[in-house]
Amino acid sequence: MSVPAAAGAARHRRRHVLDLDDFSAQEIDEILETAVSMKEVLGRAIKQVPTLRGKTIVNMFFEESTRTRISFELAGKALSANVVNFTARGSSVEKGESLIDTVRTLQALGADMLVMRHSESGAPYLVAQHFHGSVINAGDGRHAHPTQALLDLFTVRQRLGRIEGLKVVIVGDILHSRVARSDLWGFTRMGALVTLCAPQTLIGPEAFWKATWPDLTITSNLDECVRDADVIMTLRLQKERMEAGLLPSLREYTRFFAITAERVARAAPHCLVMHPGPMNEGVEIMPDVAVSAQSVIEEQVANGVAVRMALLYRLSGE
């Protein structure tokens, strides 16, 4: 069996996926359309097509990951690629080998694509300068997480039928979130109206955001900004921020910024509640909201496989 014909439309010709800042709305649209075809593949009795047979994908994760790593592994295997999972622990990296030397070694071993997560912002960009194949950023420091943003866009469009004109509220630790930055690029590029909501200490100077996204709304009043929202995206509160003195207490944060049923009731009746995971239930989102009919958190996880299949397919040139 092959990939559905719709996925064989004009192919995305870029070599790497490092962030969404240089993606056009048309490029994003093409990826989302390809993901629809890949979701159809995943709905078959045999969830595999031979599209990337003979290709080798190396998942290089220098940070712990469950959703993203497994999602990429499943995506590669569904396309019949050889998937190798690399971890720094026990590798030559622990013996002092540089990142670039490691990449050159993987290249010599025949890797065609690298999927990379790293704690240092910009690490995938550096690797892309030295690797002859394709590099996909699976999250770098607090900089970017483009595939998370793409699966968020896909989930919203699958549920609501469009992205343009929607009111999207992103709540939480904006300042330190790679997801927030990539979601900003994705949702604004596709025509959504985005509001950022966070304590001042977790969002930073308004001028910083407005310089890139002048139409952005920035506030610390969650009760007001969720009114008539189509999408509420809450981010994981990194508890180390409290230790750094950026928050008085978790209880205080939850009081003003947690997604509760009462706050969701202020939003549009069709409002989607989203979270990139992992969640701190009872802190940034209440347990009843996380499993409510309006929550699409599990759908985000499931859709990640189809979206990452679409990216691997389009980058492969097959």
From Swiss-Prot:
UniProt-annotated binding residues for L-aspartate: K95, R178, R236
Binding site for carbamoyl phosphate: R67, T68, R117, H145, Q148, G277, P278
Name of one Pfam family that matches: OTCace
UniProtKB keywords: Pyrimidine biosynthesis, Transferase
Record bears the keyword Transferase: yes
Annotated GO biological process: 'de novo' pyrimidine nucleobase biosynthetic process; 'de novo' UMP biosynthetic process; amino acid metabolic process
Record pathway: Pyrimidine metabolism; UMP biosynthesis via de novo pathway; (S)-dihydroorotate from bicarbonate: step 2/3
GO molecular function terms noted in the UniProt entry: amino acid binding; aspartate carbamoyltransferase activity
Catalytic activity from the UniProt record: carbamoyl phosphate + L-aspartate = N-carbamoyl-L-aspartate + phosphate + H(+)
EC number: 2.1.3.2
Top-rank taxon: Bacteria
GO cellular component terms, A-Z: cytosol
NCBIfam families found in the cross-reference section: asp_carb_tr, PRK00856.1
Record-stated family: Belongs to the aspartate/ornithine carbamoyltransferase superfamily. ATCase family.
Function, as annotated: Catalyzes the condensation of carbamoyl phosphate and aspartate to form carbamoyl aspartate and inorganic phosphate, the committed step in the de novo pyrimidine nucleotide biosynthesis pathway.
Subunit and interaction comment: Heterododecamer (2C3:3R2) of six catalytic PyrB chains organized as two trimers (C3), and six regulatory PyrI chains organized as three dimers (R2).
Protein name: Aspartate carbamoyltransferase catalytic subunit
Originating gene: pyrB
